[in-house]
UniProtKB/Swiss-Prot annotation:
UniProt-recorded name of the protein: Cytochrome b
Binding-site list for a ubiquinone: H201
Cited SUPFAM superfamilies: a domain/subunit of cytochrome bc1 complex (Ubiquinol-cytochrome c reductase), Transmembrane di-heme cytochromes
Membrane-crossing segments per the record: 33-53, 77-98, 113-133, 178-198, 226-246, 288-308, 320-340, 347-367
GO CC aspect terms: mitochondrial inner membrane; respiratory chain complex III
Main location: mitochondrion
Gene from which this protein is expressed: MT-CYB
Location in the cell: Mitochondrion inner membrane
Origin species: Brachytarsomys albicauda (White-tailed rat)
Membrane topology value: Multi-pass membrane protein
Length: 380
């Protein structure tokens, strides 16, 4: 008799995705982040669900409802900090996952890559709206500043901002709709993640060499399930350490002050995982230009397949582009640091130079280095 996992309509989907999936034998730990992102998503939905049971999305009670969760709900503090730090772990895994995709040329699977970009945008939107919910100072002013950027859109900008706010300022209507969207988006992300996997399984996984690995594949289970379990244990260890020892390390102390529209915090800044984009936004002295640069800083990922000039897929055997890649990584760290600094000398000029370097490496230097490497290796 054929095994039920191969015949049952539902189980055979699971089987072909996680059990009998032919996987390149050479994929390294950099391929673990997909499963880690899945774990992060499930964990965020679970903790978020329990938080939503006690949270109230009203401007008068939102801040105190979060305090109530931390003080009075059984293990409420744990759920709240797992959710907050879980978001940080989510973004660490996301950035590493995208970074792996760029390094090993995984963007050549264009459908998978494009769904991934949509997933990245959806996750960023979810995280931004979640940051508004505790209704602290940084929540309120972050929401005000970021939504206000849309007013830079010619002609319809102001109307659009007021439409999103549901009034003439960030208020009760804004908080309620942000809570609604923050609740629904993770489920949309889950659906998109399934589509992401569907497209990936059409082509099969890439591997570190960037070469065709059809001749050397092994079943996903048990080899990679056990490898993923190790990754998950490491992830949970780091998350637990953060949650129990330094729960507020990645947050902003200003968010422990209840939202006050009459008092602006000295430095308005988003969560750490948006700082690189925030630095690019601030480095352009024009509002519309800044907004465009902000969007393009992430949307630029979509043209990676078009900018690929090398005859090799991966950077594994491309030392010149490798150097550029790691300069790009260092540049992103620099932008993240600048995003958290006040707008004054020398941070302004450093931010502008780092922003120029970011776009230059991706749009100019990497494509040129690909052509140079082809010439050196006589691959044309």
């Amino acid at each position: 008799m054929t095994n039920i996992r191969k015949t049952h309509p539902l189980l055979k989907i699971v089987n072909s995705s996680f059990i009998d999936l032919p996987t390149p034998s050479s994929i390294s730990s950099w391929w673990n982040f997909g499963s880690l992102l899945g774990v992060c998503l499930i964990m965020q939905i679970a903790t978020g669900l329990f938080l939503a049971m006690h949270y109230t999305s009203d401007t008068t009670t939102a801040f105190s409802s979060v305090a109530h969760i931390c003080r009075d709900v059984n293990y409420g503090w744990l759920i709240r900090y797992l959710h907050a730090n879980g978001a940080s772990m989510f973004f660490i895994c996301l950035f590493l996952h995208v970074g792996r995709g760029i390094y090993y040329g995984s963007y050549m699977f264009t459908e998978t890559w494009n769904i991934g970009i949509i997933l990245l945008f959806a996750t960023m939107a979810t995280a931004f709206m979640g940051y508004v919910l505790p209704w602290g100072q940084m929540s309120f002013w972050g929401a005000t500043v970021i939504t206000n950027l849309l007013s830079a859109i010619p002609y319809i900008g102001t109307t659009l901002v007021e439409w999103i706010w549901g009034g003439f300022s960030v208020d009760k209507a804004t908080l309620t709709r942000f809570f609604t969207f923050h609740f629904i988006l993770p489920f949309i992300i889950t659906a998109l993640a399934m589509v992401h996997l569907l497209f990936l399984h059409e082509t099969g996984s890439n591997n570190p060499s960037g070469l065709n690995s059809d001749a050397d594949k092994i079943p996903f289970h048990p080899y990679f399930t056990i490898k993923d379990v190790l990754g998950i244990l490491v992830l949970l260890t780091i998350l637990t350490a953060f949650t129990l020892f330094v729960p507020d390390l990645l947050g902003d102390p200003d968010n422990y002050i209840s939202a006050n529209p009459l008092n602006t915090p000295p430095h308005i800044k988003p969560e750490w995982y948006f700082l690189f984009a925030y630095a690019i936004l601030r480095s352009i002295p024009n509002k519309l230009g800044g907004v465009l640069a902000l969007i393009l800083s992430i949307l630029i990922l979509a043209i990676f397949p078009l900018l690929h000039t090398s005859k090799q897929r991966s950077l594994m055997f491309r030392p010149i582009t490798q150097v550029l890649y790691w300069i790009l990584v260092a540049d992103l760290f620099t932008l993240t640091w600048i995003g958290g600094q006040p707008v004054e000398h020398p941070f302004i000029i450093i931010g502008q130079l780092a922003s120029i370097l970011y776009f230059s490496i991706i749009l100019i230097m990497m494509p040129i280095s690909g052509i140079i490497e082809n010439k050196i290796l006589k691959l044309n």
